[in-house]
């Protein structure tokens, strides 16, 4: 068997990955240093977050005291800016590149990032005290009246309205009152009175 036959057999395996001569196994010290770096990064983030909260609380107390004293409206309120300490982190990532050629190599990239200080500003008390009115609908009052849901009538009321409209339309109201002597209501009245 030649090297090409061995490679073609290996490439058919689902879990096959090329390994170059330059690859080195990671030692425990590299793994520990990565864990240590992650822990340090997490602690730095937590410290910066606590500092921001502390600064925000102090600024809010100052604003509250100014509002409480009543002199806040006459004086100009300046936004508070927070300066974050510059933190430089170095991250090393190793990427393996898989290809169909047997000479795949591992690349190592080192990047350095610097976070720029982002000033945080507290909105002025005058802007926060302003009460916003609810927005008025944009339709005209006539359209609002037309779009209101109509009151639904129950079946009995609808039947009475339909019968009344029919009687008025046909003009048979007088005839019904004269010739309705054999109706149910008349019989009930007769029985109740006698």
Curated annotation (Swiss-Prot):
Compartments in which it is found: Nucleus
Extent of Acidic residues compositional bias: 1-15
Biased composition (Basic and acidic residues): 32-68
Any GO CC annotation of this UniProt entry: nucleus
Comp. bias intervals (Basic residues): 130-139
Residue numbers spanned by region Disordered: 1-156, 171-194
Domain BCNT-C: 133-194
Pfam families: BCNT
UniProt similarity note: Belongs to the SWC5 family.
Quaternary structure and partners: Component of the SWR1 chromatin remodeling complex.
Function recorded in the entry: Component of the SWR1 complex which mediates the ATP-dependent exchange of histone H2A for the H2A variant HZT1 leading to transcriptional regulation of selected genes by chromatin remodeling. Involved in chromosome stability.
Name recorded for this polypeptide: SWR1-complex protein 5
Gene that this sequence comes from: SWC5
């Amino acid at each position: 068997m030649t090297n090409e036959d061995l490679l073609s057999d290996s490439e058919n395996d689902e879990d096959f990955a090329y390994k170059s001569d330059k690859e080195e196994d990671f030692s425990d010290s590299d793994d520990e240093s990565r864990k240590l770096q992650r822990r340090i990064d997490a602690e730095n983030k937590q410290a910066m977050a606590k500092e921001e909260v502390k600064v925000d609380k102090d600024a809010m107390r100052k604003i509250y005291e100014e509002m409480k004293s009543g002199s806040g409206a006459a004086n100009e309120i300046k936004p508070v800016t927070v300066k974050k300490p510059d933190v430089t982190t170095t991250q090393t990532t190793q990427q393996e590149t898989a290809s169909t050629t047997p000479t795949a190599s591992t690349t190592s990239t080192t990047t350095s990032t610097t976070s720029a200080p982002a000033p945080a500003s507290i909105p002025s008390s005058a802007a926060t005290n302003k009460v916003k009115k609810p927005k008025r609908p944009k339709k005209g009052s006539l359209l609002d009246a037309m779009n209101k849901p109509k009151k639904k009538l129950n079946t009995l009321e609808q039947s009475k309205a339909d019968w009344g409209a029919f009687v008025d339309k046909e003009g048979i109201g007088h005839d019904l009152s004269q010739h309705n002597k054999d109706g149910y209501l008349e019989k009930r009245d007769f029985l109740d009175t006698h």
